[in-house]
Amino acid sequence: ALIAAGVARVVAAMKDPNPLVAGQGLTQLAAAGIAVTSGLLEAEARALNVGFVSRMTRGRPWLRLKVAMSLDGKTALNNGVSQWITGPDARTDAHAWRARSCAVLTGFGTVRDDDPRLTVRDIDTPRQPRPVVVDSRLETPLTAKLLVGGALIFAARHDAEKINALTTRGAEVVVLPNSAGKVDLAAMLLELGCRGFNEILVEAGARLNASLLREGLVDELLIYQAPVLLGDKARGMADLPELVELSAAQRLTITDRRMVGVDQRILALLN
């Protein structure tokens, strides 16, 4: 269409990372005598399309782990109560991140304890993100609210009767065990990439958060930090092992920090 329109110059922010078509369009334009420039604001373009770039170059979605925490780094009281640590503005902002995601990933423990829908609320959106559950032992209740949203459940054991019951209620079950009898998280991300998922928002508990972090599968942290202190007995964001050397600490790069209502929002890339 551009060639037929007779344009004299085309400026592209970046080449298409899809290996099937990468650069071919720009090559065709140049062959037709059109002046072509690419790379203008490329970093910004990649940031806008971070999920698609991830899927094209790594075969898996961009994984963004969202956490709402206190100033002392706690995500819930020791009894599990966490509603609400952050204020209404932060919660609305979090729904905007859900809206831009292809799926919201959680674990069985969150489904059991909170029975979330993982849907976008109070924001207009053309589609809802798909709920994805890591449930190694296939224990998701048949009454779970997210089944109505066509949940995709990853399990480590095959139970034909339970799978059939979950499928009847609208879910899809994929069995992907690792050698330890748990869900193979890396294989799960590759499967999600094959299904066309670009960005995944993780809203899970400390155990799944820790597993994803330990395996190096988290690309970015989305942290909402509220001006409140919950004390040393409250729960943390991830059940990670104790470090004895600072050199072993996971380093992050903060890319954005701003106030959302009374809470602070931090975006950080994992190095």
What is the meaning of each model-derived region?
Residues 17-20, 43-44, 112, 139-141, ...:
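Short gly/pro/ser/thr-enriched loop/turn and capping motifs at secondary-structure boundaries
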Residues 18-32, 145-146, 163-170, 236:
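Active-site-proximal loop->helix
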Residues 1-44, 130, 213:
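Zn2+-dependent cytidine deaminase-like catalytic core
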Residues 9-10, 103, 199, 220:
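Residues at the N-termini of beta-strands
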